[in-house]
Each structure stands twice: as C-alpha cells, then as structure tokens.
Swiss-Prot record:
Originating species: Chlorobium luteolum (strain DSM 273 / BCRC 81028 / 2530) (Pelodictyon luteolum)
UniProt gene name: rlmN
Name this polypeptide is given: Probable dual-specificity RNA methyltransferase RlmN
Pfam families in the record: Radical_SAM (PF04055), RlmN_N (PF21016)
Annotated [4Fe-4S] cluster binding sites: C119, C123, C126
GO molecular function, one term: rRNA binding
Active site residues according to the UniProt entry: E99, C347
Enzyme class, UniProt record, top EC level: transferase
C-alpha cells in the first residue's frame, strides 16, 4: 500500500535520519538535506541541486515541502519608542493558526514565538488558555515564525535583523520540549541563513519541573524565565490551577536551584502584578523568601487586558512600592514594559483571534 506523503519540514534532524534510513539512504545525508530545508529554505526537492536526481525523486515520493503562510498583519506604535510592535497571524498547513510578534527595543529586535496551537494549562489570566489545546507545533513551524518575522523586517530594511527570540507566545514550550530544542538549534548552533546566539534566546515556562531539569542537562546556553506570579501556593493555584497543582512551588524551587547551579545562569522569575490579588506587602515578602538563596532576577510585568477576563493592572505607585520592597531585600528587579497591547500582541493576549479580541482592533 502506498504511504501518504507528509510535510518534510515537520521532521527534526533525528527524524530526518530515520526517514532517510527508511528509503535506504545513508543517514549522513540528513545534514545536507536539512541545510537545504532550513538554511536555503528550498521550496521544492528540484531546487536541491547537490542531491542526486534519484534521491530527489525518492524524497518527492514520500514528502512534500509546505511552509506556513502569513494570513494577517497588525501593528501599533503605542507605548513603543523604538518602532512599531507587529503581530502576524500565521496559518499552518493543516489550517491551525498561531500568532507571532516582533518587538523592537533599544538595541534589540525581539521575535516572540509560539510553541503550541492553544494551550492545555488554562491559566486564568491568559487568552491562549481560553482556547484549549489544539496541538504541538513542529520544530519547522516554530522556526518558520522567526523566518516570517525576519522576512517582513528585511523587506523594509536589508540591514535589519532579529537579535533576540523569546518563547513567550502561545502555548507552554516545555510541554513541547523536543521541538523547541530543535528549533533553537535551527536558529542558533547550526549557523544557517538565519542565526542568532543561544544566549539571546529565552525559553519561558510556567514551571514544568521535569522539563526544567532536562533542559539544565542539555548544555544549551539559552535563558530560562519562569512565570511565577505568586510565591504563595494557594494563590498560585487560583491563578494557574493546572501548572501550580501539578508542579508545586517547593518542587519548582528545587528545579530552579538545580538549573541555576548547573548552568551558572540566573533564572528570571516573571511576576505579573494583579490589582488586589498578588500586589500586597505580604506578597512581596513571600516572594523575597522564595527568591532568596539562588541565582535569579525578577521581572515585574503589568497585566494586559483580555476580553472575558476580569483582572486589573496595578497603578504606578503600587508597582513601584512592590519593586522597592524587593530591591531593599537585595533582589535584582526590573519593571518590564509590555508592548503591543492595542493589537492584542502583549503578554497573555495571544489567541489567534479566537477570543474575539480582534473586535478591539
Ligand atoms: S500562560 Fe502560558 S501556560 Fe498558561 S495558559 Fe497561557 S500559554 Fe498556557
């Protein structure tokens, strides 16, 4: 029986080797083929002129090459001194949609990418969580988001390039770890046409502890950010029910201590300040206790409004008071500005227009 053809861009390097072995080709060809796909971005097997004609034919019998398509572009200048924040809605070959965001900053250009279509974890402040889980993205689909943003940037200015990548878009990266790591390799170590330093890539998680432990052992130089949002177990469970119950704060702290000591890198603890929920002096003191004793820094972030979700951001005074309490205790604290709120491109707002957020445009 003839096997159905599949999209070769969905395969990781290890899977590509297996696929070549299955058609009686040596595995070492995988690197060559991978380079055609992910550096030259060949649109057809006929373009792969360094591969023999019989091999190209065999590949075309088993696979096709289909890249994601940009369906919609939005941009806003609001609150962004370094240029417009831009959001792309990307349609994947099977019709699923994800969003990806380009955020200009002083001396940097950051791509914020999605790792999953939807999300299983349903955090109460997050639009993606309202969508439910659709599926994991392949490494090619993650890599393709950076290409799409990079192409958009370079069409306007050949000299411009993406310097930083953050896995802070839709979905939980560490529930799709193998494909996220493969995408990191595509975008850094392999030195392909698009390449940045691993140190400029941040993987952001709600705290999937076994995967944090695994990441610490990979030798990757990527940075780790953890969405903490409360250092009090009950409050965290109210905000992020699934993640907080499955990976309690004590266990999470063990993983973070292990990660920081193995990698020698600080962990960033992201703390979204929510009015009347986690913004009191007592909350700050619990955070100090939690964050003391291991190599970390704290990013205070604002809540960005989401349709059907009733949290409120704190005022400037509350944010500054909270920061001062942490700083007085010796913690390294940054107030991180959010960009892209008017186009629902800021933290927690990405939902591939499934929540009706597009009505606000
Ligand atoms: S915050 Fe992250 S983990 Fe939580 S629902 Fe949103 S995408 Fe999922």
């Amino acid at each position: 029986m003839k096997r159905e053809r599949s999209n070769i861009l969905n395969l990781r390097m290890d899977e590509l080797k297996e696929a070549l072995a299955a058609i009686n080709e040596p595995q070492w060809r995988a690197a060559q083929l991978h380079q055609w796909l992910f550096s030259h971005r060949a649109g057809s097997f006929d373009d792969m002129t360094t591969l023999s004609l019989p091999l190209r034919r065999k590949l075309a019998e088993s696979f096709y090459i289909q890249q994601p398509v940009t369906e919609k572009h939005d941009e806003t200048m609001e609150g962004s001194p370094a240029g417009a924040t831009e959001k792309l809605l990307i349609q994947l070959p099977d019709g699923e949609r994800v969003e990806t965001v380009l955020i200009p900053g002083p001396n940097r250009m950051t791509a914020c990418v999605s790792a999953q279509a939807g999300c299983l974890l349903g955090c109460s402040f997050c639009a993606t969580g309202q969508m439910g889980f659709r599926r994991n993205l392949s490494s090619g689909e993650i890599t393709g988001q950076v290409w799409a943003l990079s192409d958009m940037l370079q069409e306007r200015n050949r000299e411009a390039s993406i310097s930083n990548i953050v896995f802070m878009g839709m979905g939980e990266p560490l529930l799709n770890t193998a494909n996220v790591i493969e995408a990191v390799l595509n975008l850094s170590t392999r030195k392909y046409r698009f390449s940045t330093s691993q140190r400029k890539i941040t993987i952001s998680t709600v705290g999937i502890t076994p995967e944090i432990d695994r990441l610490a052992d990979t030798g990757l130089k990527t940075k780790l950010a953890v969405s903490l949002h409360s250092a009090i177990q009950e409050k965290r469970e109210a905000l992020m029910p699934q993640a907080a119950r499955q990976y309690p704060l004590d266990r999470l702290r063990e993983s973070l201590i292990g990660y920081a000591s193995k990698t020698g890198e600080p962990v960033t603890l992201a703390y979204m300040l929510l009015k009347g929920i986690n913004d009191s002096e007592m909350d700050a003191k619990r955070l100090i206790r939690y964050a003391s004793g291991f190599f970390c820094k704290i990013n205070l972030i604002d809540y960005n409004p989401i349709v059907n979700i009733k949290f409120e951001p704190v005022c400037d005074g509350t944010r500054e008071r909270f920061r001062d309490i942490l700083q007085d205790a010796g913690l390294q604290v940054t107030i991180r500005k959010s960009y892209g709120t008017p186009i629902n491109a800021a933290c927690g707002q990405l939902a591939a227009d499934c929540t009706g957020n597009s009505d606000n445009l």
